Amino acid sequence: MKILIAGFKGDDNSAKILLDHIKKICNEDILYLENDFEISSKQIEEKLLENYDNVLIFGQKPNTTNIYFENNAILEGKKLVTDYYYGALKENLEQYAYQVMNSYDAGKYLCNNVFFRALNFKQENNLKSKIAFIHIPTIDNIEDMNHLLSSIKDYIENLYEEEK
């Protein structure tokens, strides 16, 4: 099992802060995405060539305490849908008392762009990676980052258990 965990840079970006924490306790590959359309697209495409089984991309969503699973990305009128199965992750997060929502709008900015580029690159190169995009609240709307970290860590451990 090979897992990539990605998120956008930024000292106050909750995705970056979550990745910093994950990096300390897990051995997964971590990718800090630049806050730039072209650079982040190239970064994710280069990493996808390493044939990950699962790719978890995190972004932050303002004005909410909920966690959102993005099911598709739309760019220039083209819609791409992920084949990532969110069910086990949803159950895991709900066990930690998080409200989890399915979303069909990854936004109009960097999150949607990198998700679209990843899905498109997967499709064009016939890759097997399962790609997820997860929007988490901004840092001021996360009550306890360690609690969120524990839920993500448990989920990753479960992925490895399922593989056995």
Task: Give the location of each predicted region.
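N-terminal catalytic or cofactor-binding beta/alpha core of small enzyme domains
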Residues: M1-K108, A118-I131, N146-E163
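A generic structural motif
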Residues: P137-I142
